[in-house]
Amino acid sequence: MSRVGKRPVAIASGVTANVEGQTVKVKGPKGTRSFTVHDDVSVELKDNVIRVAPRFETKRAQSLYGTARAQIANLVEGVTKGFEKKLEITGVGYRAALQGKNLQLSLGYSHDVVYPVPEGITITVPKPTEITVAGIDSQRVGQVAAEIRGYRPPEPYKGKGVKYANEFIFRKEGKKK
């Protein structure tokens, strides 16, 4: 069994946190976020440290309190540092461009894919073959990066497509004559 929930979440300097019932609100230099913890989990704030504990000794409460602790830690990290995912585009003629509030992707289709940038997420295109997705919400940053990757996932023969910067593409050998 994982013991993630037993570790307290330290509040960094420049970050204010308050707990009202089951809701944890965190405010930092990058923004404000809140998270509502499940009823089976108790949360307390004392001396700039948030502690999470299960209310009952049930299997459900045990599993939920580790998750709640990790999500609260992500709140604190998000408002201090933020989260970032880098995507790489590989393939002849495959490129990305930012046009206003939309990300335009040329991925080998007969049309360009236009992806509207959601609120709270910033997308930058340092090069036509690189995309950076950033924000204060870890889940939303990952979801947006996964949606962009989903338009043309990397294929195993030539490796063409959109992939994460640290992703390894398992390559296959082509047909032999």
From Swiss-Prot:
Q: Name one GO cellular component term.
A: cytosolic large ribosomal subunit
**What biological-process terms (Gene Ontology) are attached?**
cytoplasmic translation
UniProt GO molecular function? rRNA binding; structural constituent of ribosome
Which keywords belong to this entry? Answer: Ribonucleoprotein, Ribosomal protein, RNA-binding, rRNA-binding
Question: Which Pfam families did the record assign?
Answer: Ribosomal_L6
Which spans are transmembrane here?
A: none
Which SUPFAM superfamilies does the record match to this protein? Answer: Ribosomal protein L6
Disulfide bonds listed in the record = none
**Secreted keyword on record:** no
Q: Which family does it belong to?
A: Belongs to the universal ribosomal protein uL6 family.
Assembly and interactions? Part of the 50S ribosomal subunit.
Q: What does this protein do?
A: This protein binds to the 23S rRNA, and is important in its secondary structure. It is located near the subunit interface in the base of the L7/L12 stalk, and near the tRNA binding site of the peptidyltransferase center.
Name the UniProt record assigns to this protein: Large ribosomal subunit protein uL6
